[in-house]
């Protein structure tokens, strides 16, 4: 057999054994090329958000390269170690290290650049689809065209050639450093030896669980009123991050082994074949991969959490728009409102107009606040709030000497908590009126321009409102003292009405609920698009790494399967244990990552939107379904190994 035949044979073998690596490499190249193509596509700037579309895509492509580079280099480390005995045999038959390096380099050139070429072709073919997905998410009305960019091609080739150069340096360093004897010991030295579990290890296991639970508890109290300053919040967030990450590392280092040992002892040491194959492997292998599993779990939690928060903002855009704009269309002056009404009538669009007089008054709300944040902006004893008459609020009749608050965001409900009752003081220019606070309504009566961005409006008796109007403080009144809202009666006429609104709103001083919702969808749609694809890339790469580790374990355990089958155990007996083992190997990092992301999202979801459960559950279910594919593939590989063991 000559060198060329040897290279081709090894290449064929590698393609058969590491097809998932080739797939992940092709997928990564395709996604990167598609992203870079979008970056240079003129159509991307049709995405009207508060950030430039091309700039966002460029940032995403840099993060994508980082994820892909780490995956490829780590996967290469696994492969070169798995082939250490093969390299040792080459040296035993007289090959020099330089010649062995040339053989490996030739294999990698064909495998790597073949995948690169296929990936670029695939990336070009899906670039239009990716652009269509982006336009759909951000609700942009534009045509997506298939666009080939030479700049994108050059950038992709340069980036992946750089990664390939790093692979070659790693391989050369590995071959140069290893002696023949050490090459035959590489795989056997990578796992911890089976030994009795020490008290120290049990202590580490217990400490890991305590640290994780402590981090969860602090995260649940983050905005509950216990941390009242920015510095306190920063320290608490830093503690949560450190506690959960260190706890996760200790969990894999000791907790899993500790819990598995408790299960084993509870059975008196008598384990069936399924328990032997699952528990034993987890007890003595998982802790050797503690750092890797910690990174995978942490980044999985980060990806799920960020995607959940972005989707919460996207999902809540319409409700957030309803909170910010109290009618379909809100006007700051009567002149433009009249012009808009005339245009609606000319187009036969039915509508209802409502004008609500609004006063600004300083209100002492200190008595009804349940705790006062130390760094709260504004004085609770002199808070500027919008005041409206109960006559202008349908279905509300406020008695003399009483007041009702209406309209309050989820964010303010977490940061500024009101009691159920108490006394507030409404101040006019010369007088102060004490009023009994009678509770909080959800309805937003006026747009955010009247309410300092989301504070509640105060509903008072009409006679008191007239009195306050006569004695109002002119220094705090807004230029517009009347909220003018226009609601379109039929939803199917909303788009047309919004087009007419754009003709009137030339100075962007008025508000459209539809435009406000679209702006939020555009911004967070872009974030969701980027985080979604980055999360998908990480999911595939991390799933592949776990799969490769299982491939290595299955080959190491092959002699054990041979013995077990000779003892009379069937393939079905062994596969049953393997399924349980893979549920642990893939399930534990997934479940821990889901818990991390759940508590992270729960601690601050209200900063991003008004709906939490539906978006979060959808993201978690989708991530779990895709992640489970790798567990299924690893079971199939084990089946093949068990079948060939006898």
From Swiss-Prot:
Keyword Lipid metabolism annotated: no
Pfam families according to UniProt: FtsX (PF02687)
Record GO biological process: response to antibiotic; transmembrane transport
Gene Ontology annotations for the cellular component aspect, listed alphabetically: plasma membrane
Reported induction: Expression is induced by bacitracin, via the two-component regulatory system BceS/BceR.
Family membership noted in the UniProt record: Belongs to the ABC-4 integral membrane protein family.
UniProt name for this protein: Bacitracin export permease protein BceB
């Amino acid at each position: 057999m000559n060198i060329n035949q040897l290279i081709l044979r090894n290449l064929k073998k590698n393609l058969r054994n590491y097809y998932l690596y080739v797939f992940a490499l092709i997928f990564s190249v395709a996604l990167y090329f598609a992203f870079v193509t979008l970056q240079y596509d003129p159509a991307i700037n049709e995405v009207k958000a508060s950030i430039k579309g091309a700039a966002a895509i460029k940032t995403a492509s840099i993060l994508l390269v980082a994820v892909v580079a780490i995956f490829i280099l780590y996967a290469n480390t696994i492969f070169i170690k798995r082939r250490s005995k093969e390299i040792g045999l080459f040296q035993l038959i007289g090959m020099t290290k330089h010649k062995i390096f040339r053989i490996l380099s030739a294999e990698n050139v064909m495998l790597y650049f073949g995948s690169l070429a296929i990936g670029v072709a695939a990336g070009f073919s899906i670039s239009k689809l990716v652009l269509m997905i982006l336009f759909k998410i951000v609700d942009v009305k534009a045509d997506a065209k298939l666009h080939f960019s030479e700049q994108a091609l050059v950038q992709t080739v340069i980036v992946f050639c750089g990664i390939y150069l790093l692979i070659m340096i790693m391989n050369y360093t590995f071959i140069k450093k290893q002696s023949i004897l050490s090459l035959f010991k590489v795989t056997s030295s990578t796992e911890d030896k089976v030994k009795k579990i020490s008290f120290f290890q049990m202590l580490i296991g217990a400490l890991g669980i305590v640290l994780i639970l402590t981090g969860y508890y602090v995260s649940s109290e983050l905005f509950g009123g216990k941390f009242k300053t920015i510095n306190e919040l920063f320290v608490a967030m830093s503690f949560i991050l450190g506690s959960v990450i260190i706890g996760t590392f200790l969990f894999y280092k000791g907790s899993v082994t500790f819990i598995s040992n408790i299960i084993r002892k509870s059975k008196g040491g008598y384990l069936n074949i399924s328990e032997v194959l699952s528990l034993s492997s987890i007890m003595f292998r998982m802790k050797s991969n503690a750092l890797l599993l910690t990174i995978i779990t942490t980044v999985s939690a980060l990806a799920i959490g960020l995607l959940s928060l972005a989707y919460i903002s996207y999902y809540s855009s319409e409700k957030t728009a309803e909170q910010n704009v109290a009618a379909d269309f809100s006007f700051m002056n009567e002149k433009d409102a009249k012009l808009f009404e005339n245009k609606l009538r000319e187009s036969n669009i039915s509508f209802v107009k409502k004008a609500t007089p609004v006063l600004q008054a300083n209100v002492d709300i200190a008595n009804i606040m349940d705790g006062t944040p130390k760094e709260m902006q504004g004085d609770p004893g002199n808070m500027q709030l919008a005041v409206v008459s109960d006559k202008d609020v349908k279905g509300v009749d406020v008695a003399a000497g009483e007041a009702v608050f209406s309209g309050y965001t989820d964010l303010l409900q977490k940061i500024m908590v009101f009691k159920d009752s108490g006394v507030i003081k409404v101040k006019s220019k010369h007088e102060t009126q004490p009023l009994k606070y009678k509770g909080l309504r959800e309805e937003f009566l006026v747009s955010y321009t009247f309410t300092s961005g989301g504070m509640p409006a105060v509903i008072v008796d009409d006679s008191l409102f007239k009195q306050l109007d006569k004695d109002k403080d002119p220094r705090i009144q807004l230029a517009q003292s009347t909220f003018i809202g226009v609601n379109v009666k039929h939803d199917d006429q909303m788009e047309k009405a919004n087009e007419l609104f754009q003709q009137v709103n030339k100075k962007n001083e008025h508000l459209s609920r539809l435009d406000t919702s679209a702006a939020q969808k555009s911004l967070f749609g872009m974030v969701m698009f980027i985080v979604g694809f980055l999360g998908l890339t990480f999911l595939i790469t991390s799933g592949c790494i776990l799969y490769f580790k299982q491939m290595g374990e299955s080959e190491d355990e092959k002699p054990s399967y041979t013995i077990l089958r000779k003892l009379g155990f069937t393939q079905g007996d062994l596969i049953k244990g393997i399924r349980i083992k893979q549920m642990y190997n893939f399930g534990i990092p997934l479940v821990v990552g889901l818990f991390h992301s759940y508590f992270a999202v729960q601690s601050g979801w209200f900063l991003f939107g008004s709906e939490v459960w539906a978006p979060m559950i959808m993201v978690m279910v989708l991530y779990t379904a895709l992640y489970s594919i790798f567990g299924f593939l690893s079971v199939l590989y084990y089946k093949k190994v068990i079948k060939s063991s006898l």
